[in-house]
Design a protein with these regions (language model features):
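Ligand-binding pocket segment of bilobal, Venus flytrap-like solute-binding proteins
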Residues: 9-10, 76-157
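Pocket-flanking alpha-helical
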Residues: 1-17, 25-33, 121, 138-146
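Periplasmic-binding protein-like
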Residues: 27-31, 45, 73-82, 103-107, 111-114, 184-207, ...
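A bilobed periplasmic-binding-protein/Venus flytrap-type ligand-binding module shared by bacterial periplasmic
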Residues: 48-55, 91-92, 162-177, 193-194
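An extracytoplasmic/periplasmic, membrane-proximal ligand-sensing/linker region
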Residues: 97-99, 202-248
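Flexible hinge/capping segments at coil-to-helix
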Residues: 58-72
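A structural signal for short loop-to-beta-strand junctions that line the ligand-binding cleft
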Residues: 3, 17-49, 66, 76-77
Length: 248
């Protein structure tokens, strides 16, 4: 399997994934693998604060999450309407009580709740919003190369999204071939291919496609807790931000 980490962990819990401790896992950064060998990350998305530089000044760039509560941002921000992993990460970084309080206050800032990171990045580049708290770094840099008035900054530590991950299927028809494939994807050579596709590799010895992002301090998420409490995170996010995130 190569799928979203959250989906892979559900398959693991259902007994559909078996451990495989690939020798290449050694090079994978700790936040992107489990100790038992059920999964390892192929690539991850790093979400940061993104601003439109025509609508803001460098001094306006938020340095703390609470800076988003400044009245100057009211009605000028957009948030993806299924940002459950981001919502969960705030609770692990800040603590549940502080994060819930922050989220409720943020919701009063008249956010534009939109569907899709690509759409939000386009709105940001076009100046329809001044800021988004979850702009993906690779999208931001692509926009900058094209001349869009976009800049980003990280509020550290940054919790990477659940990585797109791979694991060995319990009933794989050719398990040895699957193991060799896993070895390649997690190897330095395989992760270099990932980098060339403008994705963030999970190995520590492969430079990120955006060198500046390599210096960002990462937060080690406890994703098992997110998976087990996902329904609660969805409900709380929906209640606070007034959307139907995660409902399928």
């Amino acid at each position: 399997y190569i799928i979203s980490g959250l989906q892979l962990w559900l398959l693991r819990d259902a007994g559909q994934v078996v451990p495989y401790l690939s020798p290449e896992r050694e090079g994978v950064l700790k936040p992107f693998k489990d100790e038992a060998g059920y999964w390892a990350g192929v690539y991850f998305n790093l979400e940061v604060i993104g601003v439109n530089t025509k609508l803001t000044q460098p001094r306006d760039m938020p340095k703390r999450w609470e800076d988003l509560l400044d009245p100057k941002w009211k009605g000028r921000m957009a948030l993806e309407n299924e940002e459950i992993p981001w919502f969960a990460s705030l609770q692990q970084i800040m603590g549940e009580e502080r994060a819930i309080d922050f989220s409720r206050r943020l919701a009063k800032q008249q956010l534009q709740m939109r569907s899709g990171h690509t759409l939000i990045s386009q709105l940001l580049a076009a100046g329809e919003v001044a800021l988004t708290p979850t702009l993906r770094v690779n999208i931001a840099e692509t926009l900058k190369i094209k001349g869009a008035p976009v800049e980003w900054a990280a509020i550290e530590p940054v919790a990477p999204n659940a990585p797109v991950s791979l694991g060995l299927a319990k009933n794989a028809p050719h398990p040895n071939s699957a193991r060799l494939f896993i070895d390649f994807v997690l190897s330095r050579e395989g992760q270099t291919v990932v980098r060339e596709l403008n994705r963030n590799p999970t190995r520590g010895d492969v430079e990120q496609p955006v060198p500046r992002a390599t210096k960002v301090k990462l937060f080690e998420m406890h994703w098992d807790g997110v998976v087990k409490n996902y329904a609660r995170y969805v409900k709380d996010f929906n209640d606070i931000f007034g959307v139907g995130a995660g409902e399928k």
